[in-house]
Regions:
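PLP-dependent aminotransferase-class I/II
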Residues: 115-118, 123-183
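Catalytic cores of large soluble enzymes that bind and process phosphate-bearing ligands
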Residues: 54-62, 83-87, 142-145, 175-178
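General beta-strand structural signal in soluble alpha/beta enzymes
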Residues: 80-83, 108-109, 165-166, 188
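Glycine-rich phosphate-binding segment of PLP-dependent enzymes
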Residues: 11-76
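Short, charge-rich binding segments
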Residues: 72-73, 84, 95-102, 130-132, ...
Length: 188
């Protein structure tokens, strides 16, 4: 099978036309790849860290080392990298259920959370294993015109508020995702 010269010329023209869009993405990817590689080198990751383990995770030097790398790459205090977490909501549920206790209060500053997080909270129905079933209180600050109501934050934070939820993504709503700058403004 061969392609006509016109088809090949069109392909080259399209590739050339999209390069201004690809270059910035490729530059970011290269920068981040180098950041990860430099962090792996600084953490002294070797082939030994990728060897099989017993599966029970006792003395799993590989997992411990990779968590060290991930924490440093993302500028975090610690990282938890487990294949047992099957989704982002699963990881968030682990954090919420591990920290919040009966009588504590979780407040969403970005209005109604996305559907799977509503299940974790027990939003409309305190289902088995939800925060509401464990008597964790939940409240939310509705967004105004797709933006966080900065003037309403102080009024919604009360004595028993132990944790604040800021949902960056829009979930299934029509609002725009929050920018890092907006999150900094919320947390200032």
């Amino acid at each position: 099978m061969s392609f006509s010269k016109n088809m090949m010329k069109a392909k080259e023209e399209v590739l050339e036309a999209v390069q201004p869009y690809f270059r910035p993405v490729e530059a970011i990817a290269e920068k981040n790849t180098l950041k990860v590689l430099e962090t792996m080198r600084a953490c002294k990751v070797s082939d030994a860290h990728f060897a099989l383990s017993s599966g029970y995770a006792y003395d799993d030097i590989g997992r411990t080392k990779i968590e060290e790398v991930v924490a440093k790459v993302f500028g975090a205090e610690r990282a938890l990298c487990r294949m047992q977490f099957v989704s982002g909501t699963h990881a968030l549920a682990t954090v919420l259920l591990g920290i919040l206790r009966p009588g504590d209060r979780l407040v969403s500053l970005t209005g109604k959370p996305y559907d799977t997080m509503q299940t974790v909270i027990g939003y409309d129905n305190p289902s088995a294993g939800s925060l509401k079933e464990f008597d964790v209180l939940y409240d939310e600050l509705p967004m105004k015109d797709g933006k966080v109501d900065l003037s309403g934050i102080a009024g919604v934070l009360k004595d028993k508020t132990k944790m604040v939820l800021i949902q960056r993504s829009r979930g299934y709503s029509m609002r725009q995702p929050l920018t890092i700058g907006e999150i900094k403004e919320i947390t200032a």
